[in-house]
Amino acid sequence: MAVCIAVIAKENYPLYIRSVPTENELKFHYTVHTSLDVVDEKISAMGKALVDQRELYLGLLYPTEDYKVYGYVTNSKVKFVMVVDSSNTALRDNEIRSMFRKLHNSYTDIMCNPFYNPGDRIHSRAFDTMVNSMMMQVC
Amino acid sequence: MNSELFTLTYGALVTQLCKDYENDDDVNKQLDKMGYNIGVRLIEDFLARSNVGRCHDFRETADVIAKIAFKMYLGITPSITNWSPGGDEFSLILENNPLVDFVELPDNHSTLIYSNLLCGVLRGALEMVQMAVDVKFVQDTLKGDSVTEIRMKFIRRIEDNLPAGEE
């Protein structure tokens, strides 16, 4: 479904980024990088009070010619960014939402792994498998 | 008690040991030792709470361990299989091990026996009821096996602490 999935730390450095191998990886790095500004904008656009009770899912961040970029920010300011092919119109908002929820749960499990130090890059087989399953479904 | 808190506490303990000791063997030994110290205390609590009497043979002991002790302290009931022909050795199969809920072993700790504490607990507890046993992990889901298997081998009865002249 997705062509690129990234997890960004609170301080805006990447914890995890993975894209479909057939495409130019660097391009996705740029796309994700650019999307972070939109994420910040979306959060700061909301009032202080709203930030506390906002939804984690930010919705569509911006569409480009070929892709749509979606965002999700946890309460600990960890950001998930997902790039989806725009030709894939079958993908509903609800499905994106549930994919983010899955991603979030998986991320929580990693945080609970005693061998993972918060802030490190994510190297986890379980997480890889989960991300792969999300990217596979398209093709 | 909340199971995540329990799992995370045990995880913190093991990772701290990994930081303190250079190689995995030392960590395994240390876990076993800590488990032993827990076991010798835990058996008193177990006997007081469970009201089980003396076991007549090792098979009965296996049942008590799997069906009562594991259930009481970890909330799981391992199955007992692979009895040796002599009846002095068996395996406990743990379908899921609450200690390893979130754990993924990193590549540089391939010889770490993450749940080795359990072996120590079993050894310590049985020693207090006059049974010397050998306990070790033979399969572990963390290492890619489909189940976790703990092998227990009865070595001998400990009789030396009976005061002379009695019985």
UniProtKB/Swiss-Prot annotation, chain A:
One of the Pfam families matching this protein, by short name: Sedlin_N
Keyword Chloroplast appears in the UniProt entry: no
Keywords: Cytoplasm, Endoplasmic reticulum, ER-Golgi transport, Golgi apparatus, Transport
Top-level taxon of the source organism: Eukaryota
Cystines in this chain: none
Keyword Iron: no
A cellular component term, taken from the record's GO annotations: Golgi apparatus
GO biological process, one term: endoplasmic reticulum to Golgi vesicle-mediated transport
Compartment annotation: Cytoplasm, Perinuclear region; Endoplasmic reticulum; Golgi apparatus
Function: May play a role in vesicular transport from endoplasmic reticulum to Golgi.
Family: Belongs to the TRAPP small subunits family. Sedlin subfamily.
Name of protein: Trafficking protein particle complex subunit 2-like protein
